[in-house]
Amino acid sequence: MKHALSLILVSAALGAAARSFTSVTTTESAVWKPGAVVSLSNKAKGTVVETLADSLEFGRWGTCFNERGYDAISMLPDSAQASVMRRVFSPDGELRINMGRIPMNANDYARDWYSCDEVPGDFALEHFNIDRDREAIIPFIKRAQALCPGMTFWASPWCPPSWMKINADYPVRSDRTNTMDPRKDALLFAGMPDGNRDDYKAPKGIFPPRLSETDYFIMDSRYLQAYADYFGRFIDAYAAEQIPIDMVMYQNEAWSYTPYPGCAWTPEGIVRFNAEYLVPTLARTHPGVEVYFGTINTNRFDVIDSVLSDSLMSASVKGVGLQWEGGQILSRLRDKYPHLRYVQTEGECGWGSFDWKAAEHTFERINHYLGNGAQDYTFWNFILADDGESGWGWKQNALIRVDSAKGTCTYTPEYYAVRHYAEFIPSGSRIVARSGGDTPVLVAVTPSGTYVVVAANLGDKKAVVSAPIGPKYLNITLKPHTLTTFSDALE
């Protein structure tokens, strides 16, 4: 396989010598405008984009299917709904999403809290059901599957059934948006951290500033085994709906101590549940389903290292899922644990601005993850209504924004930032070169041998970069605050 991939890259390099590249550019005031043809040069005339030592194969573009996203698209006329789904999920559409993330129980973009079994003490899971999922999540997925029959799926919980937690409630901490007894906040640690974190501005310090001292899951063998069985029941229930789940992660953002559905875990608890219960249970009952360690949203390398350095844990999981602050330690983790597969698991959603700044931010994040070895990329909500408000009172961005009063939708600047990558980098592409900073550039070779260069200038001055294309260079002049894709197969 490695020999065959080398032949593809060599043949692409030889063929690149005679190629010219056409381009398409997006700015804040003008989206998706065709640009000039650019020819290859023997010499670099700008900052040279770094060739990567290991050109990893890209897997899939994904999105999460949430109730509030389903509610948003349902506000549109049938024809507009069909157009949205086609543009997002069709193999010849604009985003070509071919992987879905499924929330197991409610997340923060559910209508409200629910789980598949809220009967206390039901260790045999006799009352387990996915009735709530049939209202929105499953119909949403079915519409995507109709356009992309080969779509794959992975699942993760935000919160276990409330009776499996030490606080017997879905949040981790009390808040005006939930009914949790504030006295239970002491279970986490004495005093709460500053709740005004601003992920959108790329955190400069350590997150979280203080670690939970307690597993919020009840660490009793009956509960641990019942929860592992719960994953299997969820996989089976979705399989009965012809929705195959081939990978799971134990918990969304164990380091976000949330007022919405969540669950804090210690490193010891993570290892115990995954290595002693979840992985062996699924290996026995669902041998085709892989377990990844995720989703990681902390930049505390020592914490994640303490989990993966456990020999049983490292040998049990097949990969690692990272989002938000977790992306900051991607390279270090790959260096120390090269046998694992790394994926990005959730797009950074901002605070409901739906603006050009969000587009530039997402463009840079895709460059960072793919250029540093993440092999899948999952977006969060691809569609939301109005200000993108959750059931717990906070606002987020989406790629498509619905006006509930008018029954219309807008494709946001962030949508086009994603399109600059997703339309041109299919599954099986190799990421061969990358630069970051204010001029993020990514060079990919598709399975057919086509070169794709996705570049941006996020700064206020003109920039000149040189992307390596085989033995030659594509010299690119980038105007300030532009997003551009160059391809020798661009129509």
Show the residue positions of the predicted features.
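Solvent-exposed loop/turn segments at secondary-structure junctions
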Residues: N66-D71, N105-Y109, C159-W163, N252-Y257, ...
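N-terminal catalytic cores of secreted or lumenal carbohydrate-active enzymes
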Residues: S29-I245
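Aromatic/acidic polysaccharide-binding cleft in carbohydrate-active enzymes
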Residues: R341-Y416, A433-G437
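Active-site neighborhood of glycoside hydrolase catalytic domains
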Residues: Y223-S353
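Conserved, mostly hydrophobic/aromatic
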Residues: T63, R96, F153, V248, ...
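Bacterial Sec-dependent N-terminal signal peptides
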Residues: M1-S20
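C-terminal beta-strand-rich structural cap/linker in extracellular carbohydrate-active enzymes
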Residues: L478-E491
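Carbohydrate-binding surface patches
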Residues: R434-G470, H481
